[in-house]
């Protein structure tokens, strides 16, 4: 099965580093998906949820903003702030979801629909 290498890094360290089937990113101009063999690009990311589809599971990471570099074999995300929504025990996930909502609300960009991002975060609860 074809996969692509995804890494998500913040100033505090690495959040995710693994092979994935697909990844959906919150681009500045709208969400976009990346599959193995994708054309090379660099894009700004806005507040939202990165949805990671692995071979056997789906994970999610909330970010406040960042940048992504995509090529045929890898996706490298540099985010200012990121919180894994689906890793750990149920109590840790609940804490992470609350922390993700705080991260989203810290963004003061009027072009962002905070309610839409919070709804997506809640879908992983």
UniProtKB/Swiss-Prot annotation:
This is ATP synthase epsilon chain. Pfam families: ATP-synt_DE_N. It is a peripheral membrane protein. F-type ATPases have 2 components, CF(1) - the catalytic core - and CF(0) - the membrane proton channel. CF(1) has five subunits: alpha(3), beta(3), gamma(1), delta(1), epsilon(1). CF(0) has three main subunits: a, b and c. HAMAP family: ATP_synth_epsil_bac. Keywords: ATP synthesis, Cell inner membrane, Cell membrane, CF(1), Hydrogen ion transport, Ion transport, Membrane, Transport. It comes from Aliarcobacter butzleri (strain RM4018) (Arcobacter butzleri). InterPro entries: ATP_synth_F1_dsu/esu, ATP_synth_F1_dsu/esu_N, ATPsynth_dsu/esu_N. Produces ATP from ADP in the presence of a proton gradient across the membrane. It comes from the Bacteria. GO terms for molecular function: ATP binding; proton-transporting ATP synthase activity, rotational mechanism. NCBIfam families: ATP_synt_epsi. It is found in: Cell inner membrane. Belongs to the ATPase epsilon chain family. One of its GO terms (cellular component) is plasma membrane.
